[in-house]
Amino acid sequence: GGAGWLATNNILGATGVAPNVAANTAPTDGTLRTLTEAMLKDVAQKCWEQGGDPTMLFVPGALRATVSAFTGAATKFDKTEDKTIYATVEVYVGDFGRYSIVNSRHQRARDVFLVDPGQFELLTLRAMKATPLAKTGDSENYMINTEWTLKSKQDAASGAIRDLQP
């Protein structure tokens, strides 16, 4: 998955090893530690220095409250007109960019990803094709088949903070 492509800008726990795409080596877990705002700033700077402009921060549910607790220069708002209190952070603005925070249930609970979506591209491996199947009564049946892959144009434009605990 995507975690295996983010090989350059990784912040890892002790004994953690980043993936190596060329050698087909998967990431190795390191010692768990607590996510801090300083870690986010560090990986954001690394991405920016490599020419990336990440705009999305993918966060697993277990770490969402930790991100919402980042203080930075934050101000919490209380909208009295509609009796709404905003107790979460939807956008994080840092020294190296503005990041939309995306809750993600499709990643490990110990990883956070800072992604530059402009550096990924959907490629077609096999074009969409309809193949007729056996006719059943008055209905005609088809199999629609296609094959895609996701291309990482520059893995250094994105980054990962790994080996995290809630």
Identify the residue ranges that each predicted region occupies.
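Sequence/fold signature of self-assembling virion shell proteins
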Residues: 1-46, 52-53, 65-166
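Acidic/histidine-rich, metal-coordinating catalytic segments
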Residues: 55-63
